[in-house]
Amino acid sequence: MSEQHAQGADAVVDLNNELKTRREKLANLREQGIAFPNDFRRDHTSDQLHAEFDGKENEELEALNIEVAVAGRMMTRRIMGKASFVTLQDVGGRIQLYVARDDLPEGVYNEQFKKWDLGDILGAKGKLFKTKTGELSIHCTELRLLTKALRPLPDKFHGLQDQEARYRQRYLDLISNDESRNTFKVRSQILSGIRQFMVNRGFMEVETPMMQVIPGGAAARPFITHHNALDLDMYLRIAPELYLKRLVVGGFERVFEINRNFRNEGISVRHNPEFTMMELYMAYADYKDLIELTESLFRTLAQDILGKTEVTYGDVTLDFGKPFEKLTMREAIKKYRPETDMADLDNFDSAKAIVESIGIHVEKSWGLGRIVTEIFEEVAEAHLIQPTFITEYPAEVSPLARRNDVNPEITDRFEFFIGGREIGNGFSELNDAEDQAQRFLDQVAAKDAGDDEAMFYDEDYVTALEHGLPPTAGLGIGIDRMVMLFTNSHTIRDVILFPAMRPVK
């Protein structure tokens, strides 16, 4: 047996022994009728205590004679004869407990406390004081075991090192990893901040179907499910767009939704099949209004959540304080591929030669607009590090966007890039029912030609447009990628609590 295998076998034996010992302790607690009490109530969390009392000297704390009740998980314990120090962790952070034998009811220290294990959940009452080193602590007069942990915590010095285990057992990751806990706190703050921002601008939050008869609103491969009561195959939504615009037709002129989308596609550091989007629709507005809104949203969130408009991402400082850059798709191609002759982007054969020269195979169904878009994605996208809006997307790749009045080959659309990746997509909405019907037919033709991400024909949506959609602009922002930026995370799995994983066999 190799040394590595021997160590692995020893670890399994140690774990089994640990589990056996802890289960025996739980059995003893059951016999005493105190296994899982539910009558302890705390009055503070650790962060509340630190915020209110860290600035006070010990003499002041003694004079105030403040008694508090806290609860949390025992992360460390230092037993020094008749007294011990415990680190208790709760939702707000950590607080130190000072546990002395003679300050607790008889028998609690030796017969109970010393037999408890790291990972157990405790309730503690006592008075605040500061140690000689100035650490805010609680001098315990009551200490109770609230939940017996049967499994040990990850090694306190190394935490949960296996990256895959962090995702599969997120609860252990959250217990042992401060950075991970902070990431999801920031995520919650972002969601709350977006909602407040939208409400302040007069938007109404709505909910639209997660299961749809026709998957629409984006070019993607859907998940299929079956509705037993209706005996009907349905699709998990790939986007809420068409339902939200139906609401604008109905008179709700400013709507937004934050919810999950599902796309049956690949998994990568940037993609998870189940992801969170915020989509909004605003009547009597165009894509330029949404450029302003997007810029203001990111600047506001950065200031409110991080306290500054400069965000560190990897080795780069992203500046949300200054005006965001704005380039047309063709300008971006020229900027990052200077040898490009702009006239070549107006000619199918010339553009095809360019895209093939950079290693992209041209499908038979592609027109000039798709080819130019592929060139942009290959030569420019990765360079868009600072916040940048790219405009003038071809109509061919924008089946739901309004054509430009001057040049009908392009649309009044933008995509928003930060850190070399798309974060948002917005455009003036197509509200010409006949034009929309034709574009749906074009998408059906592309699907028949083998493009399994092309859109279905949605007759009811066309009917809704025939009743009249006001001039409207719409925007979608990827929440997961936004959280990645604000938390300096470099894989989408780090910002999704339970990312998609292949089951363990």
UniProtKB/Swiss-Prot annotation:
This is Lysine--tRNA ligase. It comes from Escherichia coli O157:H7. Mg(2+) 2 binds at residue 422. Homodimer. It is an enzyme of class 6 (ligase). Its EC number is 6.1.1.6. The keyword Cytoplasm applies. Binds 3 Mg(2+) ions per subunit. InterPro entries: Aa-tRNA-synt_II, aa-tRNA-synth_II, aa-tRNA-synth_II/BPL/LPL, Lys-tRNA-ligase_II, Lys-tRNA-ligase_II_bac/euk, Lys-tRNA-ligase_II_N, Lys-tRNA-synth_II_C, NA-bd_OB-fold. Its cofactor is Mg(2+). GO terms for molecular function: ATP binding; lysine-tRNA ligase activity; magnesium ion binding; tRNA binding. It is found in: Cytoplasm. PROSITE patterns: AA_TRNA_LIGASE_II (PS50862). GO terms for cellular component: cytosol. It comes from the Bacteria.
